[in-house]
Amino acid sequence: MVKAIMHGCNGKMGQVISNLAAADSDIEIVAGIDPHDDGHNAYPVYRSIFECDIPADVIIDFAAAGAVNNLLDYAVRKNIPVV
């Protein structure tokens, strides 16, 4: 099973991807990143990508464009691919 971090998890597309992943046995969202957390996700949500310490195979990005620099810095440091 692929373990993914959902970057931008509380946006419209982040929620669509989270719901699709919940119904798919081949992928698991293990953490979310979003500055706004209303507590409705089935996984922990962090306000900053740098707060996340959960191992993952991939980061799925549907966050705002302004978040891309921190995302890519984190992904390079952790050697995690981003899609």
Where are these regions (language model features)?
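Short amphipathic alpha-helix with an adjacent loop that forms part of the alpha/beta core around
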Residues: 46-56
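A structural preference for long, well-packed, hydrophobic secondary-structure segments
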Residues: 10, 44-45, 82
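Conserved Rossmann-like nucleotide-cofactor binding loop
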Residues: 12, 38, 65
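N-terminal Rossmann-like NAD(P) cofactor-binding module of classical short-chain dehydrogenase/reductase
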Residues: 59-60
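Extreme N-terminal starter segment of soluble prokaryotic enzymes
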Residues: 1-5
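N-terminal Rossmann NAD(P)H-binding glycine-rich loop of SDR-like oxidoreductase domains
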Residues: 6-19
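Beta-strand-loop-alpha-helix segment that lines the small-molecule cofactor/substrate pocket
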Residues: 64, 69-83
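NAD(P)-binding Rossmann-fold cofactor-contacting core
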Residues: 20-43
